[in-house]
């Protein structure tokens, strides 16, 4: 409302010719006012007859001597210029909306800027008021403090927002990892079940072939027995149907032969002696698989090192070794090179590697304490594979004899009244439900343990050496024995 009044006042004190605030205003008899310069310049165009002029707005004539200065309008214009009428927003700020006066005072109680008329009104009577200039700096400082506070809060809000986004991303990753783990766990279960199913079916097929083979043999025996009896029957019938001479000729031998005939019953296979299928312990199998997965985290890159170039056949990539026979030049005797070491040597930490022994009928592998132990030129016999000699190994002999080699055991023999003491290596039989095509070896140097896993059978523990005495660096050990098929170091993703 106040700004509209100011606009109206401005229109009243605006020159109709130049459309600016009146400068040195002159008023005519008709009541219209113009800038002195504007109305003087308009004299020539508005002359109607000599000595008279006309108003540019209403065209009423006026004598030139009747132009008079309007001091009242000049004062109004001066006041308007002080108020700075041009920006309307400025008018709203600087002028009181109720009274149209300049806002020069600040009411402390209401916290508002007021004019001098507001100060005298009933609404603000008794309030503490100050000039705007007096309190502006104080409140500017207060607002600056509040501004800094809000900027800090804005930073905190942005950080909270970022934290939420980060937490959201973290949860997404965590959930995705959980999904991946769940899928991996169930895939592992399915793989285990598939493997167990395949093994059970293979065992059944082997059992079927074995039983049917023996039954076929039994059937053949029964056929031969039946044929033999048929021959005797035919002989008896011929004698009975023939002459007396044919009847009596060798009759005692025939009767004796018939009486000695004993029916051989076929071999039977009792169901109760069959291997009974039992549902596998999935929980236990999964735990075993997890243990294998855990030790596989310590997979080490192992290469093979021969003790002498001519005594072992090692592949170019130093990942495969096979048996080689060689003849000693001086003695002409056949020598065998059984073992090679792996590199690097191990003096601390946890290490894991896997060896492919598929289709081999003999092998020995594990850990050896030194080159001197491994490179036995005469070929290490079974009696040498003992922890006290620096070997922690397991092996296969004669295609189906799996064993772990422990320290020798003392025996006391009494012969002819005398006592003798002998030492024999302790060979621990290892029973495999599934023959390992791939064997994992895990060495924990600080825990002094060497463990062997049947990777082919979902990672079941084959054997574990505990309380091992590692006083020197140890090496992976590989012996292809006398089987010509190779032993191959596996890569992690093979």
UniProtKB/Swiss-Prot annotation:
Keywords: Acetylation, Antiviral defense, Autophagy, Coiled coil, Cytoplasm, Immunity, Innate immunity, Metal-binding, Nucleus, Phosphoprotein, Transferase, Ubl conjugation, Ubl conjugation pathway, Zinc, Zinc-finger. The keyword Lipid biosynthesis does not apply. The modification Phosphoserine is found at residue 86. Residues 140-223 form a coiled coil. Belongs to the TRIM/RBCC family. It is found in: Cytoplasm; Nucleus. Gene3D superfamilies: 2.60.120.920, Classic Zinc Finger (3.30.160.60), Zinc/RING finger domain, C3HC4 (zinc finger) (3.30.40.10). It catalyses: S-ubiquitinyl-[E2 ubiquitin-conjugating enzyme]-L-cysteine + [acceptor protein]-L-lysine = [E2 ubiquitin-conjugating enzyme]-L-cysteine + N(6)-ubiquitinyl-[acceptor protein]-L-lysine. Can form homodimers and homotrimers. In addition to lower-order dimerization, also exhibits a higher-order multimerization and both low- and high-order multimerizations are essential for its restriction activity. Interacts with BTBD1 and BTBD2. Interacts with PSMC4, PSMC5, PSMD7 and HSPA8/HSC70. Interacts (via B30.2/SPRY domain) with HSPA1A/B. Interacts with PSMC2, MAP3K7/TAK1, TAB2 and TAB3. Interacts with SQSTM1. Interacts with TRIM6 and TRIM34. Interacts with ULK1 (phosphorylated form), GABARAP, GABARAPL1, GABARAPL2, MAP1LC3A, MAP1LC3C and BECN1. It holds the Pfam family zf-B_box. Its main location: cytoplasm. The modification N-acetylalanine is found at residue 2. PROSITE patterns: B302_SPRY, ZF_BBOX, ZF_RING_1, ZF_RING_2. It is an enzyme of class 2 (transferase). Zn(2+) binds at residues 96, 99, 118, 124. A zinc finger (RING-type) spans 15-59. One of its GO terms (molecular function) is ubiquitin-protein transferase activity. Its EC number is 2.3.2.27. The keyword Acetylation applies. It comes from the Eukaryota. InterPro entries: B30.2/SPRY (IPR001870), B30.2/SPRY_sf (IPR043136), Butyrophylin_SPRY (IPR003879), ConA-like_dom_sf (IPR013320), SPRY_dom (IPR003877), TRIM/RBCC (IPR050143), Znf-RING_euk (IPR027370), Znf_B-box (IPR000315). Pathway: Protein modification; protein ubiquitination. Residues 186-199 are annotated as: Required for interaction with GABARAP and for autophagy. It comes from Plecturocebus donacophilus (Bolivian gray titi monkey). This is Tripartite motif-containing protein 5. A zinc finger (B box-type) spans 91-132.
């Amino acid at each position: 409302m106040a700004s509209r009044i100011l606009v109206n006042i401005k229109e009243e004190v605006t020159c109709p010719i130049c459309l600016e605030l009146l400068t040195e205003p002159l008023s005519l008899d008709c009541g219209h006012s113009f800038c002195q310069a504007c109305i003087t310049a308009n004299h020539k165009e508005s002359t109607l007859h000599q000595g008279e002029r006309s108003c540019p707005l209403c065209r009423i004539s006026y004598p030139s001597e009747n132009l008079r200065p309007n001091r009242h309008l000049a004062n109004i214009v001066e006041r308007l210029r002080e108020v700075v009428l041009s920006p309307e927003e400025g008018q709203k700020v600087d002028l009181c909306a109720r009274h149209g006066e300049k806002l020069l005072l600040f009411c402390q109680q209401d916290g508002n800027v007021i004019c001098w008329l507001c100060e005298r009104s009933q609404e603000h009577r008794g309030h503490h008021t100050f000039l705007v200039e007096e309190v502006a700096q104080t409140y500017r400082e207060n607002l600056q403090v509040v501004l800094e506070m809000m900027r800090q809060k804005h930073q905190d809000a942005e950080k909270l927002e970022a934290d939420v986004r980060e937490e959201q991303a973290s949860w997404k990753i965590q959930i995705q990892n959980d999904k991946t783990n769940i899928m991996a766990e169930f895939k592992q279960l399915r793989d285990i079940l598939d493997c167990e199913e395949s093994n059970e079916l293979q065992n059944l097929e082997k059992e079927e072939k074995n039983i049917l083979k023996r039954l076929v043999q039994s059937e053949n025996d029964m056929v031969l027995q039946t044929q033999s009896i048929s021959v005797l029957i035919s002989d008896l019938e011929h004698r009975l149907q023939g002459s007396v001479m044919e009847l009596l000729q060798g009759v005692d031998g025939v009767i004796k032969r018939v009486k000695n005939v004993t029916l051989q019953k076929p071999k039977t296979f009792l169901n109760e002696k069959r291997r009974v299928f039992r549902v596998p312990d999935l929980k236990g199998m999964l735990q075993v698989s997890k243990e294998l997965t855990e030790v596989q985290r310590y997979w080490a890159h192992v290469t093979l090192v021969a003790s002498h170039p001519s005594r072992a056949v090692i592949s170019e990539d130093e990942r495969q070794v096979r048996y080689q026979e060689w003849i000693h030049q001086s003695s002409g005797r056949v020598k065998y090179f059984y073992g090679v070491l792996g590199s690097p040597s191990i003096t601390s930490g946890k290490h894991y590697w896997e060896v492919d022994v598929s289709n081999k009928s003999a092998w020995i592998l594990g850990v050896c304490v030194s080159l001197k132990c491994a490179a036995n030129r005469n070929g290490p016999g079974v009696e040498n594979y003992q922890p006290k000699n620096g070997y922690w190994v397991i092996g296969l002999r004669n295609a189906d004899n799996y064993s772990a080699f422990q320290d020798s055991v003392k025996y006391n023999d009494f012969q002819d009244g005398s006592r003798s003491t002998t030492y024999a290596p302790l060979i621990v039989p290892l029973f495999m439900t599934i023959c390992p095509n791939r064997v994992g070896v895990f060495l924990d140097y600080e825990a002094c343990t060497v463990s062997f896993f049947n990777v082919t059978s979902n990672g079941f523990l084959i054997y574990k050496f505990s309380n091992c005495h590692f006083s020197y660096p140890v090496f992976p050990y590989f012996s292809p024995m006398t089987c010509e098929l190779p032993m191959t170091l596996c890569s992690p993703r093979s």
